[in-house]
Swiss-Prot record:
This protein's record includes keyword Transcription: yes
Source taxonomy: Eukaryota, Fungi, Dikarya, Ascomycota, Saccharomycotina
Originating gene: RPB1
Molecular function terms from GO: DNA binding; DNA-directed RNA polymerase activity; metal ion binding; RNA-directed RNA polymerase activity
InterPro entries on file: DNA-dir_RpoC_beta_prime, RNA_pol_asu, RNA_pol_II_repeat_euk, RNA_pol_N, RNA_pol_Rpb1_1, RNA_pol_Rpb1_3, RNA_pol_Rpb1_3_sf, RNA_pol_Rpb1_4
Domain of life: Eukaryota
Record field: compositional bias (Basic and acidic residues): 1734-1745
Protein name listed in UniProt: DNA-directed RNA polymerase II subunit RPB1
Keyword Zinc-finger: no
Annotated spans, Bridging helix: 810-822
Length: 1745
């Protein structure tokens, strides 16, 4: 074999996998050796035997021998197959049932299909495209055909017959018996032994011959494939022998070897095979041969599958079953799941974790020993050669060091053993495997990884000692604690992987979780406890401590804030110092009960511009709650700032707490005497009540509640009293604890503990329960031997009246242990259950992704949703918002929204508008306003129709309220001044904005419809918030501000759209599976409550996902029509009409008497009935008298039940008569009789009357009695066993338009019969609901089924108090219903879909699926996730769903000509530097190197701004153009950065570009009052948004800007295409525009300085190529062989001492070079030494380029 030279070229990927069966010819062709001997070694026991099982041609298994086929050694030879020629064909065990089915389809004589196109059904079957389904359809038709027809009736003329070429033979019925098939042939009717059918084993040989005769057409009809799977290949004639590397033997010593199970089994097969051959040659009798044939069959079968039902397992000598090939593949530890889907990996570490509050949120402390073991391969470039050389010198044992050097030819130098490690001269392009160092991104994970937040990217911080350290706040998403948990760390091994980690998985980016659109991290533990203590009223801090604390505020500006209290001594409040950690521009308000703007109780929360105004900061504010501080900061300022906020808060609070102290002791659980008395009283009272109830029960005075038995009602009362007692006791304990109490402090801060904990510690532990009931009686009617029999007292049934503080009595302790044990078992069972549910969900949804056309599809390309989540939004960007058009009365609505310029009541106050007086009576304007108001009224009706209960808080993108608040703050809105807004501006502005909000782009009808649906709700919100009246009267926005608000809404909206490539399926599966893990397994919340029992929690989720046909608790919720719903009596009527009442349920007793005379009776009680009935006899009765039987069936009915069900005797009697017609003679007593009796006699039929019949009459009557009781329905609907009336509140709008609650009666049933109940008069068929979504689907169709399914999934998750965003559950139910039937999330549901075989086999039934795939010759196109994981390829998902291409033509076409230089140039994250400074030398922005090619580039710091600007703190970050986080919130698209003068909002900002559609003379930021804008400035040029001479940052002394720079020109139009405010929805942005180039993410064809022909601008500027940082085709001195060496600069060489970025003597002639310039650092990717020289020289020669 040739030794290929090392190559870095990527390997070809596998595009598709074709399954099939091996034909005998192929097996022989592949084989390199025919195996004939069962021995492995030859006689010497030293070398492998030729022709034996370890034939040397199969591959070497010994270090001493080379492989005879390929000549490689043991490590390089992959092994080669051999083959065994079988003496007789045998069945392949995997296909035996398929072989049987094929035998049933074809004639067993001539091999022809038994049916063909002449049969109508068959014609349909053959049209099925999918081979497996076609085979099943053909088989189900053919299996009934028992003869091979020679001719069939013609279609045109049924009397004529057409020949079809059959042979006319009868077909056997075939049955599988063990490993053989048995055929039974029915004889002809007129044959003499017709009743003795012929029965014999059909041999494999026979079947093989038949299958060989199957024609190609027939084989295709049977779902086979001529090229890859013929039916006869399912039988084995030649057996492939796997090479030894598949079945390696283990050697004990030189002579002894232990063979692998497969080798052992192959030996058995060979022995049996030789045996059969010998018998054949010897001509032994048939039955002897058959015997040994079946042995061969057995060995071949167990070699492949040793778990065959009904077959003995093949065992080794020791009795251990052999591990067959099937066992190697299947199951969790098997090949597929254990070695292909999941492997062990390199570059990972695992150790115990501990907390460290001094680390940043996204850091991880890595032990030095681990940092020295794990490495990262870094390629040597001019920028890092010095650093890497130093690391190589340090060697492998000193921490920042290196372990290996890899040369460009692939050789590894191990620095542990290299003698001359110190003097290795590194060359460009080599790799150094260096230790991991601070700030490397690594992936950190804790199992079980239930959601994506269980694997996040952290920054390394190398630390001493041996545990991983992490910030406390990041433990909640990992669900970690420090009681011994271990975590794993993985080091990425390529730049691309590092980029993905830092840009997609970084902890800050996961703060807001898409699972429930709220943060998944918050302040926890001591910091949370401390933050509450610190922000209480009257917490003051003195000067010395304040000064210390200010040092703990990481970005403190050096200004000591004014103290809150000046005299007698200066004091600062805790709120004040905490505010210093909160970034400015943050607004938050939350009102709790009783909060006003003065907040006397200091509850609620108000933060304005980052200052805490009032409110104690607790879990509600800084916990992981929706709309809390964490959420707002992430949304407003970006993830990075939010991550810093965590650190800031922790540092400040922990320092304060350290000095203030907090501890808890046993004393905190002790209540005072008065409280203890209250507690004792409460418990005594409860016990007294229980005693009373017990007495009542014993005296039989209790009445059962409806739907409950007496005993249930009794238990219910007792449990209620006892729980009341515990709560009351707990409440008094809690109320009487002082606020200083440490337990109470923790509970109220939310850091630990709850009300129940206080109650149990101090007051009373309460009732213990097992399975939701009180402790049950064990032996002899007692719970424990310490109690007397039948003791129902609280003590005996497990009520613990002591508190933990007091201590439990032995009995109490025992009961408490019982309750606790149940909890433990529950948890253990739940873990396994939910783990499996999670796995099924993930496997069912794993391949669902948002595609580039906005649709959500699976790997087959089937559309699951037209728009993800039906609105195309990313769940993380969504917040709950109130749609104000829904609530409130009509009058209030009109007051809030209507403007009528002609009607003084609804006119605008003229003082509000500058144009206030001019607009009065303007009809044209009024029309505009009327249209707006009409639309709002329409919205109101529309929304009220959808949200029938008037709910108006819905999760929507873009928090408009906050944007308006930020605008008012930023632009310092003065609410006393009139605004310069005009009404047209508002109405048209909002209208224009709605048209620009595109989720989907495209003109086709379906896209338009989806687009409309996606934004309908958001537009309603938008119109309700930005209605003209509100904008002018409520918010008082100016024209400038209003435009800023609109632009901001648009930018944030576009940023909220979900990214194509997002794997939303897995996200949904995790979002549902993770809460399920937290759920309680068996919910006993309804312990005895008088209502329907409902399965919930995990068991219910299991039912839903399995689409279980028979649920545990099917139930209907029946809503009634208006007139019935409010009237209890009418509702009762319907209840009795629905509740299924059988005769049995009203019968007390039934008896059979011998009462010979029909007209009198032996039963005294019944004489009255007889007299009444026979006093008036009609002829019919008289006629039947003589035929009546002497046997009498007598039923006694239950009067209570009868009145309850509202039945009369007449109704019951008539019903019986109706059922049995004339066969039964029935009479009954009056309704008011003492006992309600029904008498029935059989009326005999004189024709059939004989002695025998007469003797059996009483038996017959017994049968009649059973039938009667069971099957006679007196009233109600079948299957509805019980109906309970419940009173629910219904929210409906009143006359005034306000929502109010109306109580209504609703029926809850046990049992479901939807179609019947719907048609009961009085039932409201539009609102009826059942939890059996299968019924809903059957009655109302799949769409209704989907809605019901969603509601059920939602209820399960909500029952536990969790919230999961709509889109996740919607995606799951859409997948389950997308095929038009309910597809379960089990192996029978989604795993039977038409996805690739590799993907299906990685779930369950691995081997069976692969067999099936082989027989049907399936083709897997490898588009799913699992397929690519198995093949070890990058799956086409996420960052793998596209390729990045370089446009070679443009590289040549657009040569950079001159250099444009600006005061500030922002180079952003694209790999295209937009022709800014062709050589990228003098860029004024330091781009952080790790973010170079990232679409989410972090802002660079531009020192033109850093040197002053109008910023408060100096320095501002600008985000990249492509960054959706626009500099994490400081761009013009982000509200809340400082004030107008901040560069983020002013024309000095490079982020504003005149070409940007949102920049116009009317644009809010273009205002003559803007402090940094001066039109009088002589060199002011409106085309240069980023140049302003009045800016203090422009000064000749500014190091980064020099007017003498040859490239400087005051009029230079420094157009910067990187403007982040450029918006793709701008009219000029159109993919069809000829000048549009998708490679430049933010370039706009309308740019004045852009012209496709202009050579000076190129979207893919050639001057930058990521692979060669210093490559520029225009540089004459460039030579491809030396990327960084330039002959024009003789003194420059990488090793030259003058090459030192810090050396001031380096290139001092470059006018723009300044040794102090912070950007000039080898870290900066835009720094290139060779260019500096080249450019300088070229400038000197040509003046400019």
């Amino acid at each position: 074999m040739v030794d290929f030279p090392y190559s870095s070229a990527p390997l070809r990927t596998i595009k598709e996998v074709q399954f099939g069966l091996f034909s005998p010819e192929e097996v022989r062709a592949i084989s390199v050796a025919k195996i004939e001997f069962p021995e492995t070694m030859d006689e010497t026991q030293m070398r492998a035997k030729v022709g034996g099982l370890n034939d040397p041609r199969l591959g070497s298994i010994d270090r001493n021998f080379k492989c005879q086929t390929c000549g490689e050694g043991m490590n390089d030879c992959p092994g080669h197959f051999g083959h065994i020629e079988l003496a007789k064909p045998v069945f392949h065990i995997g296909f035996i049932s398929k072989i049987k089915k094929v035998c049933e389809c074809v004639c067993m004589h001539c091999g022809k299909l038994l049916l063909d196109e002449y049969n109508e059904l068959m014609r349909q079957a053959i049209k099925i495209k999918d081979p497996k389904r076609r085979f099943n359809a053909v088989w189900s038709l053919c299996k009934a055909k028992m003869v091979c027809d020679t001719e069939v009736p013609s279609e045109d003329d049924p009397s004529k017959y057409i020949s079809r070429g059959g042979c006319g033979n009868a077909q056997p019925s075939i049955r599988k018996d063990g490993l053989s098939l048995v055929g039974t042939w029915k004889k002809d009717k007129n044959a003499e032994d017709a009743d003795q059918p012929e029965k014999r084993i059909i041999s494999a040989e026979e079947i093989l011959n038949v299958f060989k005769h199957i024609s190609p057409e027939d084989s295709w009809r049977l779902g086979f494939n001529e090229d890859f799977s013929r039916p006869e290949w399912m039988l084995l004639t030649v057996l492939p022998v796997p090479p030894p590397p598949v079945r390696p033997s283990i050697s004990f010593n030189e002579s002894q070897r232990g063979e692998d199970d497969l080798t052992y089994k192959l030996g058995d097969i060979l022995k049996a095979n030789i045996n059969v051959q010998r018998l054949e040659i010897n001509g032994s009798p048939q039955h002897v041969i058959q015997e040994s044939e079946s042995l061969l069959q057995f060995h071949v079968a167990t070699y492949m599958d040793n778990d065959i039902a009904g077959q003995p397992q093949a065992v080794q000598k020791s009795g251990r079953p052999i591990k067959s090939i099937r066992a190697r593949l299947k199951g969790k530890e098997g090949r597929i799941r254990g070695n292909l889907m999941g492997k062990r990996v390199d570059f990972s570490a695992r150790t115990v974790i501990s907390g460290d509050p001094n680390l940043d949120l996204d850091q991880v402390g890595v032990p030095k020993s681990i940092a020295k073991t794990l490495t990262y391969p870094e390629v040597v470039t001019p920028y890092n050669i010095d650093r890497l050389t130093q690391l190589v010198r340090n060697g492998p044992n000193e921490h920042p060091g290196a372990k290996y050097v890899i040369r460009d030819n692939g050789d590894r130098i191990d620095l542990r053993y290299s003698k001359r490690a110190g003097d290795i001269q590194l060359q460009y392009g080599w790799k150094v495997e260096r230790h991991i160092m601070d700030d490397d991104p690594v992936l950190f994970n804790r199992q079980p990884s239930l959601h994506k937040m269980s694997m996040m990217a952290h920054r390394v911080k190398v630390m001493p000692y041996s545990t991983f350290r992490l910030n406390l706040s990041v433990t909640s998403p990992y669900n970690a604690d420090f009681d011994g948990d271990e975590m794993n760390l993985h080091v990425p091994q390529s730049e691309e992987t590092r980029a993905e980690l830092s840009q997609l998985c970084a902890v800050p980016l996961q703060i807001v979780s898409p699972q429930s659109n709220k943060p998944c991290m918050g302040i926890v533990q001591d910091t949370l406890c401390g933050i509450r203590k610190m922000t209480l009223r009257d917490t003051f801090i003195e000067l010395d401590q304040v000064l210390n604390m200010l040092y703990w505020i990481p970005d403190w500006d050096g200004v000591i804030p004014t103290p809150t209290i000046l005299k007698p001594k200066p004091l600062w409040s805790g709120k004040q110092l905490l505010s210093m950690a909160i970034p400015s521009g943050i607004h938050l308000q939350r009102f709790d009960e009783g909060t006003t703007y003065l907040s006397p109780k200091d509850n609620g929360m108000l933060i304005i511009d980052g200052q805490i105004i009032f409110g104690v900061v607790d879990k509600k504010t800084v916990g992981s709650s929706s709309g809390g501080l964490i959420h707002v900061v992430t949304r407003e300022k970006g993830p990075e700032v939010c991550a810093k906020l965590f650190g800031n808060i922790q540092k400040v609070v922990n320092y304060w707490l350290l000095h203030n102290g907090f501890s808890i002791g046993i004393g905190d659980t002790i209540a005072d005497e008065k409280t203890m008395r209250e507690i004792t009283d409460a418990i005594a009272l409860a016990k007294k009540k229980v005693e009373e109830v017990t007495k009542e029960a014993q005296a039989n005075l209790l009445t059962a509640k409806h739907g409950m038995t007496l005993r249930e009602s009794f238990e219910d009362n007792v449990v209620r009293y006892l729980n009341e007692a515990r709560d009351k006791a707990g409440r008094s304990a809690e109320v009487n604890l002082k606020d200083l109490n440490n337990v109470k402090q923790m509970v109220s801060a939310g850091s630990k503990g709850s009300f129940i904990n206080i109650a149990q510690m101090s007051a009373c532990v309460g009732q213990q329960s097992v399975e939701g009931k009180r402790i049950a009686f064990g032996f002899a009617d007692r719970t424990l031997p310490h109690f007397s029999k039948d003791d129902y007292s609280p003590e005996s049934k497990g009520f613990v009246e002591n508190s933990y503080l007091r201590g439990l009595t032995p009995q109490e302790f025992f009961f408490h242990a019982m309750g606790g044990r149940e909890g433990l078992i529950d948890t253990a069972v739940k873990t396994a259950e939910t783990g499996y549910i999670q796995r099924r969900l993930v496997k069912a949804l794993e391949d669902i992704m948002v595609h580039y056309d906005g649709t959500t599809r699976n790997s087959l390309g089937n559309i699951i949703q037209f728009v993800y989540g039906e609105d195309g939004m990313d769940a993380a960007h969504i917040e709950k918002q109130s749609i104000d058009t829904i609530p409130g009365s009509d009058l209030a609505f009109e007051k809030r929204y209507r403007i009528d310029l002609l009607n003084p009541n609804y006119a605008l106050d003229p003082n509000l508008l500058e144009s206030g007086t001019e607009i009065v009576g303007d009809l044209k304007l009024q029309n505009l306003l009327d249209e707006e108001y009409k639309q709002l009224v329409q919205d109101r009706h529309f929304l009220r129709k959808i949200f029938m209960d008037g709910e108006h808080n819905w999760p929507l993108p873009v928090n408009i309220r906050r944007i308006i608040q930020n605008a008012q703050q930023t632009f310092r809105i003065d609410s006393t001044k009139p605004t310069d807004l005009s009404i047209q501006d508002v109405v048209q502005g909002v209208r224009g904005l709605q048209e620009r909000l595109l989720v989907l782009r495209g003109k086709s009808q379906i896209l338009q419809e989806a687009q409309e649906n996606a934004i309908t709700l958001f537009c309603c919100l938008l119109r309700s918030r930005l209605a003209t009246r509100r904008v002018i009267t409520e918010y008082r926005l100016t024209k400038q501000t209003f435009e800023w608000v609109l632009n901001n809404i648009e930018a944030q909206f576009l940023r909220s759209i979900v990214h194509p490539g997002e794997m939303v399926g897995v996200l949904a599966a995790q979002s549902i599976g993770e809460p399920a893990t937290q759920m309680t397994l068996n919910t006993f919340h309804f312990a005895g409550v008088a209502s329907k029992k409902v399965t919930s929690g995990v068991p219910r989720l299991k039912e839903i996902l399995n689409v279980a046909k028979n649920m545990k608790t099917p139930s209907l919720t029946v809503y009634l029509e208006e007139s019935y719903a409010t009237d209890q009596e009418k509702a009762k009527l319907i209840r009795s009409a629905i509740e299924h009442t059988t005769l049995k349920s009203v019968t007390v007793a039934s008896e059979i008497y011998y009462d010979p005379d029909p007209s009198s009776t032996v039963i005294e009680e019944d004489e009255e009935i007889i007299q009444l009935h026979f006093s008036l006899m009609d002829e019919e009765t008289e006629a039947s008298l003589k035929h009546q039987s002497p046997w009498l069936l007598r039923l006694e009915l239950d009067r209570v039940a009868m009145t309850d069900k509202d039945l009369t005797m007449g109704q019951v009697g008539e019903k019986i008569k109706e059922t049995f017609k004339n066969d039964l003679f029935v009479i009954w007593s009056e309704d008011n009789a003492e006992k309600l009796i029904i008498r029935c006699r059989v009326v005999r039929d004189p024709k059939t009357l004989d002695a025998e019949a007469e003797a059996e009459e009483d038996h017959m009557l017994k049968k009649i009695e059973n039938t009667m009781l069971e099957s006679i329905t007196l009233r109600g609907v079948q299957d509805i066993t019980r109906v309970v009336m419940m009173k629910y509140d219904r929210k409906v709008p009143s006359e005034t338009g306000e929502y109010h609650k109306i109580p209504e009666w609703v029926l809850e049933t046990d049992g479901v019969n939807l179609s019947e109940v719907m048609s009961v008069p009085g039932v409201d068929p539009t609102r009826i609901y059942t939890n059996s979504f299968i019924d809903i689907m059957n009655v109302l169709g799949i769409e209704a089924g989907r809605a019901a399914l969603y509601k059920e999934v939602y209820n399960v998750i909500a029952s536990d108090g969790s919230y999961v965003n709509y889109r996740h559950m919607a995606l799951l139910v859409d997948v389950m219903t997308s095929q038009g039937f309910l597809m379960s999330v089990t192996r029978h549901g989604f795993n039977r879909a038409d996805t690739g075989a590799l993907m299906r086999c990685s779930f369950e039934e691995t081997v069976e699926i692969l067999f099936e795939a082989g027989a049907a010759a399936e083709l897997d196109d490898c588009s799913g996730v699992s397929e690519n994981v198995i093949l070890g390829q990058m799956a086409p998902i996420g960052t793998g769903s596209f390729d990045v291409m370089i446009d070679d033509e443009s590289l040549i076409k657009y040569m950079p000509e001159q250099k444009l230089s600006t005061a500030v140039e922002v180079n952003d994250g694209g790999a295209t530097p937009y022709n800014s400074d062709a050589g990228l030398v003098n860029t004024k922005v330091d781009i952080k190197d790790e973010l170079m090619f990232s679409p989410l580039v972090e802002a660079g710091t531009s020192d033109a701004i850093a040197s002053g600007g109008f910023t408060a703190y100096g320095g501002a970050d600008y985000g990249g153009a492509t960054s959706p986080f626009s500099g994490y919130g400081n761009g013009p698209t982000s509200p809340g950065f400082g004030d107008v003068s901040s560069p983020g909002f002013s024309p000095t900002s490079p982020a504003y570009s005149p070409t940007s559609p949102s920049y116009s003379p009317t644009s809010p930021s273009y205002s003559p009052t803007s402090p940094s804008y001066s039109p009088t400035s002589p060199s002011y040029s409106p085309t240069s948004p980023s140049y302003s001479p009045t800016s203090p940052s422009y000064s000749p002394t500014s190091p980064s800007y020099s007017p003498t720079s040859p490239s400087y020109s005051p009029t230079s139009p420094s157009y910067s295409p990187t403007s982040p405010s450029y918006s793709p929805t701008s009219p000029s942005y159109s993919p069809t525009s000829p000048s549009y180039s998708p490679t430049s993410p933010s370039y706009s064809p309308t740019s004045p300085s852009y012209s496709p022909t202009s050579p000076s601008y190129s979207p893919t500027s050639p001057s930058y190529s990521p692979t060669s940082p210093s490559y520029s085709p225009t540089s004459p001195s460039y030579s491809p062989t030396s990327p960084s060496y330039s002959p024009t600069s003789p003194s420059y060489s990488p090793t030259s001492p003058s090459y030192s970025p810090t050396s001031p003597s380096y290139s001092p002639t470059s006018p723009s070079y300044s040794p102090t310039s912070p950007q000039y650092s080898p870290r900066s990717p835009s720094y290139s030494p060779s260019f500096n020289n080249n450019d300088k020289e070229q400038k000197d020669e040509n003046g400019t380029h």
